[in-house]
Amino acid sequence: MEKYKEVFVFISAAVAAYFDTTITFVYALLIGFAFNVLAGLRADEVKITMTRFPNFGILNYRGDKLVDSLKELGLITFITYMIKAIVDLMKFDDKSAYAVQILIGIAIYYYLKNGLRNLTKAYPKVRWIRMLYYLVSFKFK
């Protein structure tokens, strides 16, 4: 059992070292994802009711959108790290971090634009959110 523990520690250290250079980009992607999901829940008028502390109910909620969004996040992360692995295999010196940075930046822009669109649906009278959405999505009237 001790041999397996050493192998597991070696493999986990190698994986952690590989993802260490780009983990902050993934954190930023997760923040953008959370903003998009929360804005989507607000746009769909999902209500959370508390009955007692451990129990709560969710009204007007379908889990299909959240599952699709989680699949999308997984696909974005998988494709990004697949491209990082390909660039690393081509032996470019630390250029794979730039590829990850650009791809995750595009994904964060998508999440920001979609979240602002959901917030304009949730708060149609707030002009600041609408103006920010038009500015981010390049839709000038």
Give residue spans per PLM region.
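Membrane-proximal cytosolic segments adjacent to transmembrane helices
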Residues: 1-6, 49, 53, 109-141
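Membrane-water interface of transmembrane alpha-helices
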Residues: 34-50
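Membrane-water interface at transmembrane helix exits
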Residues: 39, 43-44, 80-88, 92, ...
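Alpha-helical membrane-embedding segments
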Residues: 68-75, 85-89, 128-141
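Transmembrane helix interruption/hinge and helix-loop junction motifs
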Residues: 18-25
